[in-house]
Design a protein with these regions (language model features):
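Acidic catalytic loop of the alpha/beta-hydrolase fold
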Residues: 124-129, 156-157
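Alpha/beta-hydrolase fold nucleophile elbow
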Residues: 24-36
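Catalytic histidine neighborhood in serine/cysteine hydrolases
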Residues: 139-156
Length: 184
């Protein structure tokens, strides 16, 4: 079993949503949410066929694609090696051992097709997943969207750094889209 940076996990999220709607009923609104790789997973899932009860997506510090995050990490931490050949080797390894390509999925492609509203959250001091990745996803997102940038928050710390602001954004997002009609 391998972690696939959201590529295969997106289908797990969609399957979970279908299971929840089947067992709890379509009248109960569902939201997909995740942090870091979980955020990437739910952003990728947003473009899949989801049940109508999925009313929105909450993504805290998601990355653009497996290739983009690997490139970013290599540039930040392995500066003395060229990223290109290493990414090629990583792609071969992920294809052989985990059954996916690091070039296979992009949150930018997914959010440019989604109908579900998305709340993007990201800390401006994130040195692992660059804040620009959420900004770019927000910019290309085709659905209703909101972007909360938390000054000074490192990777995954937005809620802890500015709890009142993030809580207020979450509450407003959930309230707004819980009461809306199901998305077909």
């Amino acid at each position: 079993v391998y972690i696939t940076f959201g590529v295969h996990e997106r289908r797990d999220a969609a399957t979970w949503a279908q299971y929840a709607e089947k067992h709890f009923g379509p009248e109960h609104p569902l939201f997909l949410g995740g942090l870091s790789m979980g955020a990437t997973t739910v952003l990728l899932a947003s473009a899949l066929e989801l049940p109508p009860s999925v009313r929105g997506v909450i993504a805290d510090c998601g990355f653009s694609s497996p290739e983009a995050i690997m490139r970013s990490v290599l540039r930040a931490h392995v500066k003395w090696l060229p990223a290109g050949p290493l990414l090629g080797l990583m792609d071969v390894c992920t294809r052989v051992f985990a059954g996916f390509s690091i070039k296979e999925a992009s949150t930018l492609d997914a959010v440019s097709k989604t109908k579900r509203p998305i709340l993007f959250i990201h800390g401006t001091a994130d040195t692992f997943v660059p804040c620009a990745m959420s900004q770019t996803a927000y910019d290309v997102c085709a659905s209703e969207k909101q972007l909360i940038l938390v000054d000074g928050a490192r990777h995954g710390y937005s809620y802890l750094v500015d709890r009142p602001r993030v809580q207020a954004a979450l509450a407003a997002f959930l309230e707004k889209y819980t009461s809306q009609e199901a998305i077909q």
